[in-house]
Each structure stands twice: as structure tokens, then as C-alpha cells.
């Protein structure tokens, strides 16, 4: 017997319980966003007393690892600051990604989001033993990208979220192939005391009641030192109902084995509880040196499943065994900033530890794959020691432990100089200990029809075990040099030299009594244990080195208007194939080459800000996953693709009371050669090299068009400052999979448009707001999948991942 055992592989061989994204709110466009090129995206704003009346506030970013006005940064960049994050009710990744036009994502639930930018997606990322992400995620100065999904950082007391589109291979390196997202926290301030809190109570249509409590305090300790403490406690209401169902497993001699889920039936069962905090200390050692240690941590418990089965009804699913995830992480970071002569010196180091414990119902997969596919007509294969047939339903017990260490030392010359340099050294090491135990329900011990034990040795009742350690190492030296050729023309040259060394070691598979293809039967030495596994059948290594360049020319048309042209390159490291005990060759890096022209402009005394970029990207030898002859995932370099697109955002202070903001992206992302089942150098599909998709096919996951629009109107009510706000997001149709067979069975995810509204008042130190998210209770399809490979299971049990239903809430807060 063989089957796929790939814990969170997206769409094409999804064989685990997929939890969909808790979307928060998304919004409906009342008119096509494309017609509003100058009506604009989120760039932070506020009228400032020092600015001209009605002017937008300057946006300060650190995207180029130095503090700059965003309008002077020749990068396609969006930033959402503290005020906009609050106004848009952003509390997590799903909330802010809606307002980033070039960003799309897939989700296996909170803490398991997989991010894509500019359409750079093959639909095969997410497996714990597969490709690294193509988008880098940063928390302050530290990378927090993990292969199983992003950290679901609670967004509160955050200075801004920065989204850098396109390859960032010079300053950010590996896994910033298609872009980088940075979460920048508010830092301690020794100049003044500050504190505040916010409370939120909300009700979800078709679901339960949720709440949030958040607070912070900035406490000066001395003239040169301060501490900042932040905490949050949030409960997100569930809205998926686990309904009653009875399934029949085929038994011997035409009989059946019933399985009733009555013990798991519950309404609104996909609730989430999140608690966390942050503590930061900032000490100014003297006039030139500052030390900032920070500790941030969070625990999150997720119940249930975030998808529903349309065949059962709206927001209904039938699962038979518990679904839970407990995710906890702590990041300890240290940033040292100073000056030596005319050089700015920065050291940024961090240590991240993350633990997840998962229980996932595997009944669907058992029914569709293990029974019907493998043993239909043989009665039942699983029996107890007395020879009686048992319920073959399985549950996955998963435990993942991550540690991530990163260190960066860089030097910068003053930004006022005609010649400017940023250079540095970087080191990163990520260790992922993977344990996935596939346990047969009531199978202790497990025996076959031949009355011999088929459990994995040492794991009674476990039909399959994955016990592996993955280590990804990355080292780099980088530099960017800019020179003002004339007062208006600046040239930049950049390069990053990198090396990577990635290993994958351990055990995956069955017992020798159950399979001769994977597991104990293929161990190097079956009598020598590896960790908690019976033996070792995998020990692979992938190494490489290279250089990613960057060339940029920037021209200042006027003090508030500039255009730029960029050539840049990004990469994603290669890795180890598990298949065949590591006998298959490692998969190689893939590369994204970017040609881009962009603009940064301000108009009408800075009442209008309009930025954008047009780009052409070539994705060479992209990594993709497919099922090999033994039904295990293989990662190969066999794809060529190109992405042509435009992304733009703007903000307009139409009047003293009315502000409009928005943005959109249009992407033409498609294959430029056939997508075949075998890796290069074989690129022509034939009978022995099955065609998965023809040249010209649209890449999956990302819509061609995505846009958003926000309008905010302020006015007085007596002594109160009041506001009305409406936000809208449109997402075009997407494919969940690149393969034509899967597309035919799953269908296309339709476009959706939804709306958010808010009314609030404020006076002195307090503010209150009534809001409704997803006001018209539209049911978007954020994701669509089958529990096992559609080529095997067909269209049995297709699941939709919905957005969160209409949510009505009240917020109240104070600041001191």
C-alpha cells in the first residue's frame, strides 16, 4: 500500500485537514476599482499642524534598512501605519493583507498562512519537507519566515506594516524572492509617559460572540531609558457547524463498518483564543549608541475546521474526530545601533522558538484513499488481534518544534552624502523537528488480515510515522551603493553573495509488515533507532551558492515627483527530496528576474499621493510538487513562467473632511512552457512524462485583478469628533491548482466583493466605534480543496474556505 503523506501541501496533494483563513473583513467595491487609478490605497495619513492645511502626512519607512521618507525610496512599497491599522480594524495577517494589492495567500488556518506576491505561485508550497517560502516575513529587523506558515502576529501597538513588492535579493536575501513583508513595532520612548487600552465585543452572523482586550504602557525609567509593555487577549467566534453524519466503511463479505460523529457535533466550533504580550527596553548608552532588547510571545488555540462542505449546506462540515491546533512562540531579539565616525552601525540578532501541537481528523482521506483506492473488494484490511474488523478512521497527531537564529551586522554611510553605502553580513539557521503520527482509531495494537502487526514499531496503532529534523542554513554578504550622478539622477548598484546548506534527516513511512516501499523496509540500518523512530531511512543534503544583483536608476522630475527603473534578481534555496530514502537528487534553487519601472509622486501641495510600478518578471526553473510512483511528494525544477503586471496605490485628501485611499494590481502570470510530471532536462510532455498544464496557462492562487478602496469622512457632533468610513476589496477569480485535471474537478474560485462600514466618535482621550464587517454577509470562496490528490479521489468531498460572515461590533478605548 502506498499513499501521499504530505502534511499541508496545498491543493494538489492536500491530505490533511485544512483549516481556512479567518478572513476578518473584506469589502465590496460598488464600482470597478480599475476606473479609480488615482483613488488610492492605504498610505498612512493625518493632517499635521506643521504641514500645509489639508496636506498628507509624510510616511517614514525603513525598507532600505535606513530611515527615509517613503516617497524617496525607489521600490514598489506600500505602508500601513498605526492609525490606518486601527481604522481598518486590522488585528492579524488576514486583515492587513487585503489592503496590499500585490499580495495573495493560502491558509491552513490561523498561524498557517502561506504568502505570495506578484503571482509567483505554483500551488505546491507548504509541505513541511518541501520548498521554502518565496516571500520573506520580518518582525522588526528579524526574519520570522517558517516553512509551515507565517507567525500569526497579533497586530496591536504596531508602528506600521511595510510591503516590498518584487525581488529583495540584495538587502533581504533568501525567501524574499517575490517580495518582503515587515511588521514594525512601536519602540520605547524615554521622552514621555504613554498608555492606552482598547476593548472590542462583536457578534458573528451564523456564529458566536467574540471579544478583544488590548493595552500598552510606555514608561520612562530615566532620561535615557524606557520600557514598553504590550498585552492582548482575543477570542474569535466560530461560525462553522460540525453537523451529524454517519459514514460506512466497506467491511468483509459485503458488510459495512459504520462510524457516527455524534460525539463531535457542535455549532460554531471553529473558535480561536489568542493571548500574548511584548516587552521592550530601550537604553541610550550615550549620544551615539542605543541598545534595544525585546521579548515577544503568543499562544493561540484553534478549534475545529475553517472549511465547509457545500453538499451539506452553508457553513457546515461533518468531521468525526477532534480538530485542534495549539501554537505558541517566543521571539527574543536584540538591536544595537550606534555611530563610528561617519558610519552608522547596526547589529540585529534574534532567537525564535515555536511549538505547535495539532490534532486533525483524517477520516475523509481514510475513506476516499485508504479504503476505496487501496483495498476495495478485499473486505477490510485493519483488524484487531482477535481478527475482528475495526474502524479504520485515522487521526493525525502532529508536533512541530522550530528554532530560528539570525544575526546581521551592517554599516551605512550618512544618507545625506552624495555617495551612500549600506553593507553587511548575515547568518541564519532554522531547525524544524517534525513529528506526524497517523493513528488508526481504536487500533491498539493494529493487525492485518494475516494477523501480523502492521503498526510502526514502537508506535502501537500508528499506520504511518514521520519523525524528521530539517535544518536550513543561510549565510550572506551584501552591499548597496548609491551615487548622485547629478542633483536629479541617482544610480544604485547592489549585490548579495550567499551560500546555503540544507539537510533533511530522519524517518518517514510504514512498518516493514505493511509496505516494502517506504519506512522500515528501506531503513539504512533497521536495528538502530533514530530519535523516537524505529530507524533512519532519510539523510539528504542540498548546498549551493550564488549572487543576486540589483541595478537602479532614479530620476527626480521635481522635488515631489520621481521615476525609477530597476533590474533585480531574487532566489529561493534548493532542498532535499524525501522520495526513495533521499535517492532522488535534491531540487535546485529557483530564480526570479525582475524588470521594473515605477513612480513616486505628490500633487496639489501634497494633498494627493500616487505611486506605482509596471514590471515584467521571469520565473526560471520554479519548484513544484507532484506525486511520484509511490505516492509521495517529489519537488522538481521543471517550470518556466513570466509575470507581467502593474501595481499602484494612492491617497487623496479631497476636502478637509473627506479622504480617499485605495489601490489595485493587475497581473498576467502564466506558464511559458509545458508543465510536465518529470523534472528537467526533460521538458517535452509525452506518454511517459504526463502534461499537467500547457504553456500559456494562468498560474494558480493569485487573481488577475485585486483592488481596494476606502473613504473616510469626519465631522463634528456637538463637542464630539465623529467619522463615517467605508472600505471595499475586490478579488478576481483564481484557480486553486495549476494542473488541468485538478482545475476541472475543483473548478475556479469565483471573484468576490464585500463591504465594511464604521461610525465612531471621539473626545479628548477616549474613542468609541460601531462597525460592521462583511456588511452584506457575502460568502467568498477564499480557497477550495480536496482531502487527497484529486487525481486519486476525484471530486469527492470538495471543501470551500469562506470569509468570516457578517460581524457587528462595538469598540471603546482610551489613551493617556
Model-identified regions with their sequence ranges:
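N-terminal Sec signal peptide and the immediately downstream disordered periplasmic leader
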Residues: 1-88, 94-99, 218, 287, ...
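N-terminal periplasmic accessory domains that precede
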Residues: 93, 114-116, 138, 163, ...
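Short acidic/polar hinge/loop motifs at secondary-structure boundaries
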Residues: 127-128, 134-135, 140-165, 213-215
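Transmembrane beta-barrel wall of Gram-negative outer-membrane proteins
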Residues: 205-303, 328-332, 401-407, 411-428, ...
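Membrane-embedded beta-barrel scaffold of Gram-negative outer-membrane proteins
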Residues: 214, 335-363, 556-572, 579, ...
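Solvent-exposed loop segments that connect transmembrane elements
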Residues: 239-268, 303-320, 361-397, 437-467, ...
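Gram-negative outer-membrane beta-barrel transporters
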Residues: 487-491, 616-618, 637-738, 811-815
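C-terminal beta-signal and adjacent terminal beta-strands/loops
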Residues: 728-739, 760-816
Amino acid at each position: 500500500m502506498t499513499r501521499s503523506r504530505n502534511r499541508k501541501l496545498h491543493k494538489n496533494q492536500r491530505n490533511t485537514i485544512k483549516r481556512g483563513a479567518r478572513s476578518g473583513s473584506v469589502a465590496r467595491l460598488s464600482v470597478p476599482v480599475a476606473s479609480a487609478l488615482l483613488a488610492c490605497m492605504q498610505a498612512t495619513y493625518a493632517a499635521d499642524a506643521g504641514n500645509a492645511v489639508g496636506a498628507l502626512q509624510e510616511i517614514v519607512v525603513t525598507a532600505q534598512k535606513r530611515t527615509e521618507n517613503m516617497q524617496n525610496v525607489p521600490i514598489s512599497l506600500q505602508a500601513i501605519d498605526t492609525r490606518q491599522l486601527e481604522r481598518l480594524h486590522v488585528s492579524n495577517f488576514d486583515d492587513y493583507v487585503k489592503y496590499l494589492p500585490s499580495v495573495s495567500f493560502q491558509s491552513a488556518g490561523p498561524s498557517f498562512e502561506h504568502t505570495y506576491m506578484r503571482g509567483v505561485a505554483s500551488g505546491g508550497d507548504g509541505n513541511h519537507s518541501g520548498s521554502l517560502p518565496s516571500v520573506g516575513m520580518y518582525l522588526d529587523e528579524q526574519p520570522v519566515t517558517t516553512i509551515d506558515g507565517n507567525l500569526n502576529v497579533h497586530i496591536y501597538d504596531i508602528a506600521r506594516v511595510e510591503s516590498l513588492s518584487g525581488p529583495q535579493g540584495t538587502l533581504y536575501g533568501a525567501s524574499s524572492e517575490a517580495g518582503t513583508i515587515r511588521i514594525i513595532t512601536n519602540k520605547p520612548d524615554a521622552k514621555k509617559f504613554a498608555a492606552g487600552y482598547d476593548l472590542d465585543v462583536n457578534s458573528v452572523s451564523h456564529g458566536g460572540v467574540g471579544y478583544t482586550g488590548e493595552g500598552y504602557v510606555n514608561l520612562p525609567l530615566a532620561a535615557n531609558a524606557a520600557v514598553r509593555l504590550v498585552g492582548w487577549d482575543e477570542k474569535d467566534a466560530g461560525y462553522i457547524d460540525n453537523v451529524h453524519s454517519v459514514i460506512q466503511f466497506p467491511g468483509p463479505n459485503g458488510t459495512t463498518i459504520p462510524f457516527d460523529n455524534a460525539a463531535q457535533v457542535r455549532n460554531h466550533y471553529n473558535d480561536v483564543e489568542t493571548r500574548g504580550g511584548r516587552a521592550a527596553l530601550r537604553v541610550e548608552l550615550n549620544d551615539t549608541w542605543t541598545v534595544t532588547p525585546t521579548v515577544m510571545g503568543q499562544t493561540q488555540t484553534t478549534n475545529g475546521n475553517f472549511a465547509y462542505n457545500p453538499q451539506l449546506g452553508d457553513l457546515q462540515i461533518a468531521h468525526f474526530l477532534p480538530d485542534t491546533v495549539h501554537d505558541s512562540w517566543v521571539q527574543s531579539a536584540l538591536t544595537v545601533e550606534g555611530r563610528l565616525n561617519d558610519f552608522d552601525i547596526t547589529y540585529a540578532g534574534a532567537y525564535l522558538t515555536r511549538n505547535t501541537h495539532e490534532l486533525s481528523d483524517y477520516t475523509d482521506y481514510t475513506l476516499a484513499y485508504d479504503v476505496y483506492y487501496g483495498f476495495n473488494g478485499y473486505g477490510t484490511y485493519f483488524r484487531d488481534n482477535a481478527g475482528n474488523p475495526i474502524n479504520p478512521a485515522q487521526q493525525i497527531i502532529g508536533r512541530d518544534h522550530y528554532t530560528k537564529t539570525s544575526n546581521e551586522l551592517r554599516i551605512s554611510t550618512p544618507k545625506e552624502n552624495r555617495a551612500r553605502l549600506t553593507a553587511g553580513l548575515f547568518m541564519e539557521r532554522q531547525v524544524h523537528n517534525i513529528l506526524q503520527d497517523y493513528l488508526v482509531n481504536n487500533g491498539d495494537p493494529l493487525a492485518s488480515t494475516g494477523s501480523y502487526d502492521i503498526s510502526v514499531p514502537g508506535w502501537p496503532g500508528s499506520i504511518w510515522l514521520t519523525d524528521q529534523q530539517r535544518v536550513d542554513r543561510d549565510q550572506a554578504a551584501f552591499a548597496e551603493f548609491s551615487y548622485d550622478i547629478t542633483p536629479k539622477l541617482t544610480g544604485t548598484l547592489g549585490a548579495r553573495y550567499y551560500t546555503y546548506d540544507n539537510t533533511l534527516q530522519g524517518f518517514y513511512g510504514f512498518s516493514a509488515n505493511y509496505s516494502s516501499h517506504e519506512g522500515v523496509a528501506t531503513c539504512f540500518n533497521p536495528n538502530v533507532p533514530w530519535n523516537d523512530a524505529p530507524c533512519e531511512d532519510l539523510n539528504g543534503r542540498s548546498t549551493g551558492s550564488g549572487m543576486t544583483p540589483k541595478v537602479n536608476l532614479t530620476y527626480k522630475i521635481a522635488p515631489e515627483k520621481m521615476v525609477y527603473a530597476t533590474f533585480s534578481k531574487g532566489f529561493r534555496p534548493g532542498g532535499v527530496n524525501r522520495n526513495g530514502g533521499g535517492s532522488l537528487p535534491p531540487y535546485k534553487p529557483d530564480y526570479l528576474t525582475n524588470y521594473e519601472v515605477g513612480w513616486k509622486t505628490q500633487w496639489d501641495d501634497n494633498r494627493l499621493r500616487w505611486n506605482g510600478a509596471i514590471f515584467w518578471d521571469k520565473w526560471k526553473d520554479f519548484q513544484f510538487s507532484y506525486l511520484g510512483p509511490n505516492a509521495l511528494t517529489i519537488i522538481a525544477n521543471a517550470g518556466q513562467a513570466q509575470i507581467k503586471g502593474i501595481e499602484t496605490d494612492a491617497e487623496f485628501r479631497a476636502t478637509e473632511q473627506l479622504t480617499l485611499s485605495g489601490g489595485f494590481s493587475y497581473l498576467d502570470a502564466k506558464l511559458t512552457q509545458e508543465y510536465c510530471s518529470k523534472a528537467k532536462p526533460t521538458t517535452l510532455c509525452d506518454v511517459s512524462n504526463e502534461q499537467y498544464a500547457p504553456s500559456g496557462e494562468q498560474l494558480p492562487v493569485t487573481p488577475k485583478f485585486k483592488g481596494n478602496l476606502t473613504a473616510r469622512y469626519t465631522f463634528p457632533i456637538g463637542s464630539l469628533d465623529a467619522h463615517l468610513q467605508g472600505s471595499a476589496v475586490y478579488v478576481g477569480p483564481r484557480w486553486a491548482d495549476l494542473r488541468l485535471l485538478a482545475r476541472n474537478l475543483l473548478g475556479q474560485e469565483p471573484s468576490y466583493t464585500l463591504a465594511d462600514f464604521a461610525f465612531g466618535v471621539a473626545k479628548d482621550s477616549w474613542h468609541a466605534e460601531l462597525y460592521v464587517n462583511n456588511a452584506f454577509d457575502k460568502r467568498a470562496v477564499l480557497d477550495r480543496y480536496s482531502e487527497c490528490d484529486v487525481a486519486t479521489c476525484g471530486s469527492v468531498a470538495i471543501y470551500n474556505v469562506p470569509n468570516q460572515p457578517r460581524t457587528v461590533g462595538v469598540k471603546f478605548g482610551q489613551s493617556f
